[in-house]
């Protein structure tokens, strides 16, 4: 049985990308090509390419599925009426005026009290707790105040304060549905010029929405993976996407998830017969080696943190030994890691397909 320690690997800190490249598609791409069935390092071949070369590895009638969520300026600093400092990170917008949020303070805020945010620009009212989160009520539409006064919530491993460059580069060019507190980072490598080349090659694309929560950075704290409680995120699948999947299957194309968030949404809505159900809801799907994929054939993804649930996910798709070999190669070749880093193209190992 695999344990948390099986997903650890040494990572020199200087390989953690601290800023995005000026040219989105100029990042590097590690292509992990499957040569044979079985989960061994010898069963795959690795090719070091530029991300813009991904067109060479896609086929006419392949379907790329993107997550169109938009990162909101979810972080606030402020104070309690007593003067004590608080930090608020919005996790989810519940309705026009209400959000779920993490609140950091020296003492737990009291239900009914006020938190004064953004240099006293406005105050929110503390509501009931929901697990580790607080409900907060905004005096005006929450998304308006978030956009006006909030700060971009860069991941904890990026050490600089967010600036105007981050506000552009920590969004995909197709982001349109506000609600995420972390970017679907595999999509950061795509630009309009690359989309034009994909169109010319006959590669199709479609979109879903999954609002990425801060739980994506939540560490796994138990060696026994079965004891880990996965965070929940809201997603929506349109009938247009469900139809695009049906057409792709009929034409013999592959369903390729752009990012782990797209993959998690697709697999959450996948039916036993391999079709995709339109609709919306919450997912806390936790994909680990041994999972049988119903829908996704391949994945475009960045490099993930040691011992993370996302490293477990890519290991389930491509194979534990294949991913170990790929990550060793990436470290040796000085790839850039995490949100602003480089990418991989992974194909599903045959043993991971649903019967």
From Swiss-Prot:
Subunit structure, interactors included: Monomer.
UniProt KW Mitochondrion keyword: no
Protein EC: 2.4.99.17
A Pfam family matched in the record: Queuosine_synth
Keyword list, A-Z: Cytoplasm, Queuosine biosynthesis, S-adenosyl-L-methionine, Transferase
Role: Transfers and isomerizes the ribose moiety from AdoMet to the 7-aminomethyl group of 7-deazaguanine (preQ1-tRNA) to give epoxyqueuosine (oQ-tRNA).
Reactions catalysed according to its record: 7-aminomethyl-7-carbaguanosine(34) in tRNA + S-adenosyl-L-methionine = epoxyqueuosine(34) in tRNA + adenine + L-methionine + 2 H(+)
Origin superkingdom: Bacteria
Pathway: tRNA modification; tRNA-queuosine biosynthesis
A GO term for molecular function: S-adenosylmethionine:tRNA ribosyltransferase-isomerase activity
Higher taxonomy: Bacteria, Pseudomonadati, Pseudomonadota, Betaproteobacteria, Burkholderiales
GO CC annotation: cytoplasm
Similarity comment: Belongs to the QueA family.
Protein's UniProt name: S-adenosylmethionine:tRNA ribosyltransferase-isomerase
Disulphide bridges: none
The keyword Transferase is assigned to this record: yes
Chief localization: cytoplasm
An annotated GO BP: queuosine biosynthetic process
């Amino acid at each position: 049985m695999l344990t948390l320690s099986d997903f650890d690997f040494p990572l020199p800190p200087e390989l953690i990308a601290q800023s995005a490249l000026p040219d989105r598609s100029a990042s590097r791409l590690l292509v992990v090509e499957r040569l044979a069935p079985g989960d061994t390092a010898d069963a795959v071949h690795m090719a070091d390419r530029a991300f813009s070369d991904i067109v060479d590895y896609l086929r006419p009638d392949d379907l790329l599925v993107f997550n169109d969520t938009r990162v909101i300026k979810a972080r606030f600093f402020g104070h309690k009426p007593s003067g004590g400092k608080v930090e608020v990170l919005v996790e989810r917008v519940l309705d026009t005026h209400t959000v779920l949020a993490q609140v950091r303070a020296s003492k737990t805020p009291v239900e009914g009290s006020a938190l004064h945010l953004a240099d006293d620009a406005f105050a929110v009212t503390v509501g009931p707790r929901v697990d580790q989160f607080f409900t907060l009520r905004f005096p005006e539409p929450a998304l308006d105040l978030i956009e006006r006064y909030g700060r971009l919530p860069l991941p904890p491993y990026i050490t600089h304060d967010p600036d105007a460059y981050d506000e552009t580069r920590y969004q995909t060019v197709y982001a349109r549905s506000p609600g995420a507190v972390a970017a679907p980072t595999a999509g950061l490598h795509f630009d309009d010029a690359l989309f034009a080349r994909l169109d010319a090659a006959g590669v199709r694309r479609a979109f879903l929405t999954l609002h990425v929560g801060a739980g994506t950075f939540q560490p796994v704290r138990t060696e026994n993976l079965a004891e880990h409680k996965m965070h929940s995120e809201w997603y929506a699948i349109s009938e247009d996407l469900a139809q695009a999947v049906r057409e792709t299957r009929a034409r013999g194309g592959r369903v390729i998830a752009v990012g782990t968030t797209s993959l998690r949404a697709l697999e959450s809505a996948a039916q036993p017969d391999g079709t995709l159900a339109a609709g919306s809801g919450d997912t806390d799907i936790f994909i680990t080696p041994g999972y049988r994929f119903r829908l996704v054939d391949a994945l475009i993804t960045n490099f993930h943190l040691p011992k993370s649930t996302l490293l477990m996910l890519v290991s389930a798709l491509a194979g534990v030994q294949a991913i170990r070999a790929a990550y060793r190669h990436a470290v040796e070749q000085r790839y850039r890691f995490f949100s602003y880093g480089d990418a991989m193209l992974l194909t599903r190992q045959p043993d991971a397909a649903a019967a």
